[in-house]
C-alpha cells in the first residue's frame, strides 16, 4: 500500500518513518510518498529517511498534493500552516492583550485554526475526489480540525490523533509494570481538554492507586502541578493543558516571562536539520522537539486499521454514544475499538459534570469559529473569541481580531 505524508519537511518525519518501519513486518507498506511546500527542508529530511529505510519500502517525493494522495490508502496530515512564524504570532499576539499565548489553546488556537481551515478544506476535497483515503490528522489544532472535517466537510474517513493519550497510557503502564495494551482508561473530552475518570490495568480498577501515586509525586514537587486538594475534590486526572484554564495567572506569568516556545523550536529545528544532513540514526536532539510517542500513535493506528486484531486507541472522532450525556455528533477524544478499517466508539457511561462544563463551552467556541470561517464573518469570529474561557475582554476583542486577521491575511479574509 501507499502512505502519503503531507508536511514531509517536518522535523518529526524521521520519527514517523521509524514507526512505519516498526509496523512494516506486520502490514505491507510498498511506498511512502512525501509532499511539502518547503522543498528544501523536505529534501534534507527525505534524504535522511532514505538512509533510515534502506530498501524496506520505496521512499518518494511528489511535487503536488494530488500526486501524493492519488493512489494512497492512508494520508497523514502533519503540516503546519504558516510554519513556525505563524506559531510565533499565535503565541505572541495574545500576550499583548494579557491573554495566554499557546499554539492550540485559546486565542492562539483560534488563529491557528483560521489558517488551517482553507488548506484542510482544499486537501480533503482533493482526497475525496481521488483516492478516498483514510486521513490521519496531526495538524494542530487537531480536535478542532477533526470537528471541521467530520461535521462540516462531512468526510467520514478522517481520524484526529494526539500523543497525549498514549503518553498517559505509557506512564500508567510503567507505574504498574504492565504493557500498553493492559491499560484501559475511561477517557473523554476534547483534544488538549481531556479527562481521565477511571484507570484499569489488566481489568482491575486501580484508579485510587493512581491518585495516591499522583499525590505523592506532587507533594515532592509542589510548584509543578495542581495542589493535592485539587485531585481530592475533582477526582479526575486532567490533561496537562488544563493548566491554562485552571492556573491561568501562573501560566500567563510563566509564558510572558520566558522566550516563546516557537522561538525555542526554531533553534532546535536549526540544529536538527544540520544533523539530518548526514545522520544515519535519529538524533537525540529530536527529544527536545516534543511530540513523544507521536510515531507510535500514528503507526500503530494504521497497523490496527489494517488487521483484524481489534485494538483500542484513543482518537478524535464523533461521540456516537460513548459519553451518554454528551451529544452524539460532538467530536471527542475517546477510546475506540479499531479493526479492519473501522473505528468503533466504546460505551463509557456518563461524563462528570465538572468535565462537561469545559467540554460544552469549548465545543461551542469551536463551532462558532468554524461557522465564522465558512461564512467569512467577523461578527461570528468575535462571538467565537468572546465565548472561549481564555478569550479577550469586550474592550479588546475587536482590536485583537483585527491583529490576528492581519497576521493571517495570506490565509483567510473575513468580512
UniProtKB/Swiss-Prot annotation:
InterPro entries: GlycHydrolase_4_CS, Glyco_hydro_4, Glyco_hydro_4_C, Lactate_DH/Glyco_Ohase_4_C, NAD(P)-bd_dom_sf. Binds 1 NAD(+) per subunit. Optimum pH is 8.0. Active from pH 6.5 to 10. It holds the Pfam family Glyco_hydro_4. NAD(+) binds at residues 1-64. One of its GO terms (molecular function) is 6-phospho-beta-glucosidase activity. PROSITE patterns: GLYCOSYL_HYDROL_F4. Substrate binds at residues 87, 140, 163, 261. Its cofactor is NAD(+); Mn(2+). GO terms for cellular component: cytosol. Its EC number is 3.2.1.86. It is an enzyme of class 3 (hydrolase). It comes from the Bacteria. The active site is at residue 241. Gene3D superfamilies: Lactate dehydrogenase/glycoside hydrolase, family 4, C-terminal (3.90.110.10), NAD(P)-binding Rossmann-like Domain (3.40.50.720). Mn(2+) binds at residues 162, 192. The record marks 103 as: Increases basicity of active site Tyr. Keywords: Carbohydrate metabolism, Glycosidase, Hydrolase, Manganese, Metal-binding, NAD. GO terms for biological process: carbohydrate metabolic process. It catalyses: 6-phospho-beta-D-glucosyl-(1->4)-D-glucose + H2O = D-glucose 6-phosphate + D-glucose. Hydrolyzes cellobiose 6'-phosphate into glucose 6-phosphate (Glc6P) and glucose. Is a retaining glucosidase as it hydrolyzes glycosidic bond with retention of anomeric configuration. Reaction mechanism includes redox steps involving NAD and stabilization of intermediates by Mn(2+). PANTHER family: 6-PHOSPHO-BETA-GLUCOSIDASE, 6-PHOSPHO-BETA-GLUCOSIDASE-RELATED. Belongs to the glycosyl hydrolase 4 family. Homodimer or homotetramer. Exists in a homodimer/homotetramer equilibrium state in solution. This is 6-phospho-beta-glucosidase BglT. The lineage of its organism: Bacteria, Thermotogati, Thermotogota, Thermotogae, Thermotogales.
Amino acid at each position: 500500500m501507499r502512505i502519503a505524508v503531507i508536511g514531509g519537511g517536518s522535523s518529526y518525519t524521521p520519527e514517523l518513518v521509524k514507526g512505519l518501519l516498526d509496523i512494516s513486518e506486520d502490514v505491507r507498506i510498498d511506498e511512502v510518498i512525501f509532499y511539502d511546500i518547503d522543498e528544501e527542508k523536505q529534501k534534507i529530511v527525505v534524504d535522511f529517511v532514505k538512509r533510515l529505510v534502506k530498501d524496506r519500502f520505496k521512499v518518494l517525493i511528489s511535487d503536488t498534493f494530488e500526486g501524493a494522495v492519488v493512489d494512497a490508502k492512508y494520508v497523514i496530515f502533519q503540516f503546519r500552516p504558516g510554519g513556525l512564524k505563524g506559531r510565533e504570532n499565535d503565541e505572541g499576539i495574545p500576550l499583548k492583550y494579557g491573554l495566554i499565548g499557546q499554539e492550540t489553546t485559546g486565542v492562539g488556537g483560534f488563529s491557528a485554526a483560521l489558517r488551517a481551515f482553507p488548506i484542510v478544506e482544499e486537501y480533503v476535497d482533493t482526497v475525496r475526489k481521488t483516492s478516498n483515503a483514510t486521513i490521519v490528522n496531526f495538524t494542530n489544532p487537531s480536535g478542532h480540525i477533526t470537528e471541521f472535517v467530520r461535521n462540516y466537510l462531512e468526510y467520514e474517513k478522517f481520524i484526529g490523533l494526539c500523543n497525549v493519550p498514549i503518553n498517559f497510557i505509557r506512564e500508567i503502564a510503567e507505574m504498574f509494570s504492565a504493557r500498553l495494551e493492559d491499560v484501559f482508561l475511561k477517557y473523554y473530552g476534547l483534544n488538549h481538554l481531556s479527562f481521565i475518570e477511571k484507570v484499569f490495568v489488566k481489568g482491575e480498577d486501580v484508579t485510587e492507586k493512581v491518585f495516591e501515586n499522583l499525590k505523592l509525586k506532587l507533594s515532592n514537587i509542589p510548584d509543578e502541578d495542581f495542589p493535592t486538594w485539587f485531585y481530592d475534590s475533582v477526582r479526575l486526572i486532567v490533561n496537562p493543558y488544563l493548566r491554562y484554564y485552571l492556573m491561568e495567572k501562573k501560566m500567563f506569568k510563566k509564558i510572558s516571562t520566558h522566550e516563546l516556545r516557537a522561538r525555542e523550536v526554531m533553534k532546535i529545528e536549526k540544529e536538527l536539520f544540520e544533523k539530518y544532513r548526514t545522520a544515519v540514526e535519529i538524533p537525540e536532539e529530536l527529544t527536545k522537539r516534543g511530540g513523544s510517542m507521536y510515531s507510535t500513535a500514528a503507526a500503530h493506528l494504521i497497523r490496527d486499521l489494517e488487521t483484524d486484531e481489534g485494538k483500542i486507541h484513543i482518537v478524535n472522532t464523533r461521540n456516537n454514544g460513548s459519553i451518554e450525556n454528551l451529544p452524539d455528533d460532538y467530536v471527542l477524544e475517546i477510546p475506540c475499538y479499531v479493526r479492519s478499517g473501522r473505528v468503533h466508539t466504546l460505551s463509557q457511561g456518563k461524563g462528570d459534570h465538572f468535565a462537561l462544563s469545559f467540554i460544552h463551552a469549548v465545543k461551542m467556541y469551536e463551532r462558532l469559529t468554524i461557522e465564522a470561517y465558512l461564512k467569512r464573518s467577523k461578527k461570528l469570529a468575535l462571538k467565537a473569541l468572546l465565548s472561549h474561557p481564555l478569550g479577550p475582554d469586550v474592550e479588546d476583542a475587536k482590536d485583537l481580531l483585527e491583529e490576528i486577521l492581519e497576521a493571517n491575511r495570506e490565509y483567510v479574509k473575513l468580512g
